[in-house]
Structure formats: structure tokens, C-alpha cells
Amino acid sequence: MTNTKYYPEVNSNADFAGLEREILKFWQDNNIFQKSIDDRNGELEFIFYDGPPFANGLPHYGHLLTGFIKDVYARYQTIKGKKVERRFGWDCHGLPAEMQSEKELGISGRLAIANFGIEKFNAHCRASVMKYANDWEEYVTRQARWVNFKNSYKTMDKNFMESVLWAFKELYNKGLLYESMRVMPYSWACETPLSNFETRLDNSYRERADKAVTVSFVLSHPVATTTGSFKEYRILAWTTTPWTLPSNLALAVGSDIDYALVPKNDVCYIIAAYSVSKYAKELGLSGEENFEIIKGSALQGLNYKSLFDYFENHPNSFKIFAGDFVVEGDGTGVVHMAPGFGEDDQILCESKGIELVCPVDNSGKFTKEIPDLEGLQVFDANDKIIIKLKEQGNWLKTEQYIHNYPHCWRTDTPLIYKAVPSWYVKVTQFKDRMVELNQQINWIPFHVKDNLFGKWLENARDWSISRNRFWGTPLPVWKSDDPKYPRIDVYGSIEELEKDFGVKVTDLHRPFIDELTRPNPDDPTGKSTMRRIEDVFDCWFESGSMPYGQAHYPFENKEWFEDHFPADFIVEYSAQTRGWFYTLMVLSTALFDRPPFLNCICHGIILDSTGQKLSKRLNNYADPLELFDKYGSDALRVTMLSSNVVKGQELLIDKDGKMVFDTLRLFIKPIWNAYHFFTMYANTDSLKGKLNFSSKNVLDVYILSKLKIAVQKIEESLDNFDTQTAYHAVSEFFEVLNNWYIRRSRARFWKSEKDTDKQNAYNTLYSCLDTMAIAMSALVPMISEAIYKGLHHCEERNDTALSGKSNVIVRKDTSLDKAISGVSHKIATALSVPCNDAISVHLCNYPTLSDFEINHELVATMDNVLDICSNSLFIRSTENIRVRQPLASIAIISKHNNNLKDFEDLIKDEINVKAVIYRDDLENYASKKLSINFPMLGKRLPHKMKEIIAASKKGEWEAIAGGLAICGETLNSDEYKLVLEPYSHIKGAASFENNSSLLILDLELTPELIEEGYARDIVRFIQQARKDADFSITDRILIEIISEFNLSKIIDNYGDFIKEQTLGEFAKNFTPDYVSKVELENHQIQLKVKKS
């Protein structure tokens, strides 16, 4: 009779990478991704915004991490019945593209680009910006992430750019834009200003050593003093930017700070009293002197002589003012003011009628206004300035100052602060509203809402959105070129441009947009012309415009956008609280008075195993594709998303992929092992599993209850955007399925009778695998698909994805009309699994098991049984007593023994003891010890910790309702733990049931017990020989044992047991199929086996 096999022949040692490649091909050939979208009618939608990456570099582990998270929730919401569009996007404009093009073209700087030609330069940017797009698609596809590349949006597309123009004009019309010359962080390497939040992006600060100089400024008039008169009065100022001193126009002091008048020869030095000791050497002090003290307010309004003659006649300058930013700390308590190079400096000086000077050009070099430094880069000018100060007699001290200093996030060069003209969004005008709208957002981790992001919003500054660069969306601002006839025009659409300029606009980029000019309507002479300002948008403005830009709103899809805004979910690295999340929030608040998203995950950063940033230079990480080819992408997905990195913390990953291998071994392989076990025995027995939850077998009810608990836990976790807990639920379930249910049910699978009990076992295991394949499909999409396809296999194909090995021909099963044949419609509905038409696990609906009731009492009791058994096995391991060695008894000391008695035989068999003894006199064997949670309690009661520790050691405490009383305080449940501790003379003991019960193993070995243990060893040796000889599990065998060790008594007493366990008969003088040599109690044993 032919053995009918209903399932693929599954390889226990699967090639998971090869399996995944077959799954990817299956998805592509059958258009599964698009089907998963089309199958949802759109009544329920999950709106997901995919933040646009730059495509001028390869994806790194951070991109993959973000992509895995995006994919998990998109897949999950899909099987929850929602339509989830996943449109990919590309960030195309800005410095990354320009810097790459400059490098490839061999040019550098704005002047070189202008000479090369803006049209040619931008054409190169356009061509190069998508250089790695195909590589991105390969990486993203290989990581099993489903996205729509064909309909991707690009920030350089005309439609996207037009929406950006609309947003700008909307802000302008709302009065939320202004133009100003303000001091900003400035990248002289890129020749452009940066937003204040760009200097707060990850890794933008570096430790840097600068020369700090203390300079003396000569006052124009004496200071009123009681200590006598001096030839000169000098006030000391300290700065870490000596290059700004040629532009000094004022000094600032703290009005309430005490300043000392320090005499040296015929000069009186003025310095904050707190700083005098730091200058003892330079001022010739012994430390015993007393000085006259005056308040900073007494210095206000005094004039001083300019250090240099560059701006000595600058109006209203060279005075001392009070500044509330001057505080005690580093320096001298006196701040030198260069309003062209400091934000506080500019604000204070402008309030005093002092116009700024800025003698530094776009490349960070001094201009002709400083003739003896002209053409010198500002940082290179420090030494020359210090020399000049010494020559003039204004120098007092130079020191090395090590501090964290902002650097350009593109070039890694130190920034300067420099006054530049720019257009600003009046963020400060509506920042309070942003704070309010932020409360509508669910942040993961939760503390981001009011801390990392919330505090950033509270301190938001006006946002500079213009950049004097080339490759970007142009600011739609035209100005009159004649200041006699001022006029500003702002455009918000291509239609408006075409109407005013009378030409067809096909490209909004420079230089084409710059060529649009027209006569100034406000000039009666007709001589002036309206010309576009040269600036382009900060690329962060464009990425912040992504929600409406991708839809070409409001020119198209107006109703669609308004129905799909805000997003249900976005995710990025936590530094984006200063980047994309922030710009989305600014523009969404200003334009729509709504939060841009409702749920946001801020994940952490991935570092190497030593905690260093992943770097090509350090060569400290593997190419992700290599890991995929070695271990599969599911393993990397689990490694990342089950770690704390999803909660904003760091993940350290080794270059060799050991962590990923461990995930494969400890998480993926157990899932596959359960599937392999089912298919192997089901094919051997020619039985099909059915989706059925009606078995009354206690193990079946238990595992089905655990299944529903796991399914609910996964659902609850993913609803709360918590992949860590979801993965734990999967792992915990398969631990119980493999190491308890399957192992305890093996006799049911092994027996020859195809009775109801055996079918129930197959149905139960099938139901577990099928249900979990769907429930965990978002978490491990590849292996879930392979298992689901294998369980529902109904077509003839050469399909590696079903088996985990190559070239396996699987028979056609025409009888499998329904994926859940034999199950009532009621149960099928409860599972919410589409029957015949779900060719992929990702086209199913999430299982609910609503008609199956969890047996909570059974689960609690069986969990206790598991706890008893695992603790007992741990004791055996600790005492070096193998599991095959029987023990006399186990004593279970508990108040809940009645529940455990039903499982006595199971406990005896699992831990290999002869008897179970039940007791309830726990006080005779153990006592409760108090364990204090010191970090937790120390926060609340720091002053009583010493007293509480002493009392806990003496046992001076009492358990009460709702907590624990000690030293007059009531401890909360998270501040302590009561640990059940056996008395010192009790051996082989362990607590269980949350430290409320105790078990004690009898560790004494009698001769009879030892003999039975040897019999069990012999069974193991024979079973291993069967496996090594590649016998089938159903083959009957002949056995011969040859040994110097006297086994006759063991064979006489336990021969029937050995034969039953091994399907064997003892025999002699046969030609063996396999011979093995083993060792028992230091004696050699030769074992011969042969198929009978």
C-alpha cells in the first residue's frame, strides 16, 4: 500500500537563507504584496508615512532597523483587516547630493559651481542622486520589507516641489514668514547656514581643543573706586573664539555679579570676583589680598577703547552693557560682543543701536575689512590675532580649552556662528500650540513626549528655511532690483508663475526658475525688474512637507489627503525628534493646526560590540546582505526588534554575526523544529492535521489555552507598538510547545493505532502551527510563510520554500478542498482564517479563537507542574545526577496540592521519580526572607534605608494586605520581594509558584535505582545507534550487547522495557547493519543493531 504524504519532506537542518529566497520568489511570482492591499476594501485604513532617505549611499543597519519596524506594523495592520499603502520616498535635494556631486566633478565651493554652470551642476545632481536606488530596492526586498517602489515619490519631482511652494505661500499669507539678517550656525565648508536643530542631530558635536584667550580692554575713563587712582583701568574678557575679537563692538557684564578691582603696579584690572584666583599668577597675587568689590551694574555705560582700528569709528560701539546671559562659571564674568558672530551678541547690540559687522566671507575667510588677515580662514587666524594682542599689550593669558563643539553633519568640519540673511518661520509664534498638539501623540518610549520632544518644542526657535545653495526647491520669492521701488512677490503654484511670467514652466529647479523675470509693476519708470532671490529651501522643509508633497496637495488628491492626515504611525531614530519629526510638527501645526502623526516610535542606535559607531573606516560591521545570505533576514529582524533598541536604547552587534546566529538557534530553529516534527510524523502516518479545538485531552486543552494566550499577547503587544513583548510571547509559546507538549505527547504520535486520540494530537499540533504562523507572520514573515504554505500545500511544485532543502518534489493533494476541512463553520469564523483562497499567510486575517475558552485553572496548574519539573531537573544538573537515573521521591510542600495530584504520573515520568509525597507544613522546611529593591526604595525613603536594611536582616517586618510593614513604613509591591529560602540542612530543594511553595528531591541512590538507571542508559545507546544507522522510526531491529560490564541482571530485570522502547529483540550471531562503541560507568560496551 502506497504511503500518502500530505506535507512536504521538511529538512530539520533547513537552509533558512535559501528558504527565504524561495519565499521572495513566491511573493513576486504571485504578486502577494499587491494582493494584500487589494484584498482590503479600504473601509479601514492604517496610514503610514515612510520617511524619505537619501539614495546617494547604501543602506546601513540603522536603515534596516527602521525598515524592519515599519514592515512589522504594516503587515500586522494588514492581517488585522486594514488597508496599508506603503509608498516609498526619496529625499533628493540638499547638501548630501551637492557634496557628492562636487566630489565627483572635482570642484569645491559656490564660486566653482557658478563657474562650472548651475544647469550642468544640477543636472549632475539629478543623475547621481538616485545612484543607489537599485541597491536600496535589493536590500529592502531582501529584508522581506514590502514597499511600493514603482509609485515612489521624490522630493525633486515637479509635483512635490509645487506643493512645497504652496506651503511657503500659505505660511507667508498667515504672517508666519519673515526675512532677517541673523546669526546662525554656519558651515563654511558647505558655504551655507544650518538650522539650529541641525546642530542637535546625532553625532553633530565633537570634542575639540581650542585656544581660549583672556584679553584686557582699556577703559576710556576711570572707575569710581575707594582704593585710589590708577594710570589705567582694564577690564578682562575671556573668549574661546579669538578670531571674533577683530569684530568686537561691545562688552557684557552681569549686573548682579560681584567684580573685583585688582591693582597691579599702576593698572587696575576688573574681573569677576569668583575668577580672581584663576589669574593669580598673571596678576601677581599671593592669595592673601583683599579687593574692593563693585556690582556689574556699576560698570554699565562705561566706554572702552577698541582693541583694533578696523571698526574704531563704528557708531554707538565700545560700551559696557548688562546681559542676562552673563552668569558665573568659566571665564572672567565679562563677555566680548561681536554681533556678527553671536546670537546673544546680536540681540544685545541691536537693542543698543549697534549695527553688526561681519568681515568673514561665505567660505569662512576674512574679507578686506580686516586687511592684515584677508583671505585667512578664521580658525587659522587665531595665532596671528594672539600675537597682535601681545604686541599691543592687550593679552593676558592663553590656555587650551577642551569642549564639545558643533560640527557640520555633512563635512565634519567645525561650524562657526555667522550673521547671514535668511527667511525664517515664526516658530516661536505657535510653539505653545505645538506643545498642546504633542499631547495627542502616543510616543514610544513614552517619556519622549514630555522630555526629549516636549522640551525641544518648549524651547523652539524660529527656523531658518533658506539656503544659498543650488540643488533644491527654490524659494518662490521675487524682489525688485531697485530699492527705490520695493516690491516682493510670493508664488504658491506653477499656474501663478505661468500667469505672471507668460511662459510654460516645466522645471522648477535653478537656473530655469531664475530666468523668470518681469518688469516691476510698482515702478512707474518701467526700469526695475522683479528677480527671484537665489536661495533654495532647507531640505528639511521638503521632508517635513512629505505628507502633502507626495499627494501633490492641494492641486490634486485634496479630499484623499484630508482623509489620510495625520498618519497613524511613523518611526525613525530618536535623533529625528530634532529633525524629521520636528519639521513635520512645525509645518503641520502652522498649516493645518493638527499633529502630523498619532503614534511614533523612536528607536535607538546600533553600535559595534565595543560600543563604537558602525563605520566603513573602522571596518567593524558586516555587509547586511552577507548576514542575510548566511542566516536569513528573519533572524536579523528578530535580533533587532526583540532588543531594547526598539525602546530607544543602544544595540551592540558583532561583526561576525554571532548574535544573529544565536537568534537563529534559539528563536527560529525551535519554530522550525515543531513544524518539522509535525510533517515528519504526519507523513509517516499518512494523516492530515485539521484545525480543531474540540479535544478533551488535558495536554491538548492546555496547549490550546497557551496558544490563545500567546495569540492575545502578540495582538496586545503589537497594538501597543511593543515588538519586544510580542517576540517574547512567540518564543515562550514554542518553548512550551516543543519542550512540553510535543515531548509529553510523543507516545500519542508514535503509537501504531490511528485512533481518535492520535488524530486529536495531530489536529492540536496542526492548529497550533497554523494559528501561530498567522499570528507571528508580521514578526517572522519568511518562516511563517514557509510553514503556512507547507501546512496548506495543495499544488504540485518544486518548492524549496516548503521544505527547507533543495529539489524536493511534493505530491499534488487534490483532496485538500479547504484549508480547515472538517472544522465547523463556527470554529472557522472564530479563527478568522480565509479558507481556500488564502495562498499566503499574509493574506489571512489575524486569529481570534473567540469560540475557544481558555482553561485558566488548568493553565495555572500545568504551569506549576512545569515549574516543578524544571526546578527538579535543575537540581539534578546541579547535583550531577543524570535524568535517566531514577530517584525515589519528590516532596511537594504546598497549599495547592489537590490540583497537582491529577498530574502525579506526569511529574513522576518527567523528572523520573518513583513517588510523589504531598505536604503542607511549609514552615518546617523553609522561611520567607525579605529582599529589598534598593534602587527603587532608595528614591522614596533615602533617609530610612539604613534602618530598613537592619530590620530586614533581623526579620523585623510583617506582610500585610497591599504591601509590607517595616520600620513604620509600608513598602509597595515593587519595592521588595519575599523569597522562600529552605533551611540550611534541607538538600535538593527549590521554591516554585512565585515563592509560595517548595519541592524537595530525595537524592539518595539505592542499588535498585542505579540498576534501573543503567537500563535507561542502554535504551538511549540503542536509540542513538538507530539514528546513526539511519533506520526509520518504524523499523524493528535486532540487538546484541557485548560488554565486560555484567549486564545480565539488568537485561533480565529490564529486558522487556528495553525492547519496547527500542522496537528491538535481543539476538546473537547476526551480521549487523551498524556497530557502535559506548561507555557505561567507565566500561566499554559494543552495540550491534540490524533491521529485522
Curated annotation (Swiss-Prot):
Cofactor section = Zn(2+)
Q: Which GO terms describe its biological process?
A: isoleucyl-tRNA aminoacylation
Task: Tell me the superkingdom of the source.
Answer: Bacteria
What this protein is called in its record is: Isoleucine--tRNA ligase
InterPro entries noted in UniProt: aa-tRNA-synth_I_CS (IPR001412), aa-tRNA-synth_Ia (IPR002300), Anticodon_Ile_ABEc (IPR033709), Ile-tRNA-ligase (IPR002301), Ile-tRNA-ligase_type2 (IPR023586), M/V/L/I-tRNA-synth_anticd-bd (IPR013155), Rossmann-like_a/b/a_fold (IPR014729), tRNAsynth_Ia_anticodon-bd (IPR009080)
Q: Which gene encodes it?
A: ileS
What is the scientific name of the source organism?
A: Rickettsia africae (strain ESF-5)
Entry's family note = Belongs to the class-I aminoacyl-tRNA synthetase family. IleS type 2 subfamily.
The free-text domain note is: IleRS has two distinct active sites: one for aminoacylation and one for editing. The misactivated valine is translocated from the active site to the editing site, which sterically excludes the correctly activated isoleucine. The single editing site contains two valyl binding pockets, one specific for each substrate (Val-AMP or Val-tRNA(Ile)).
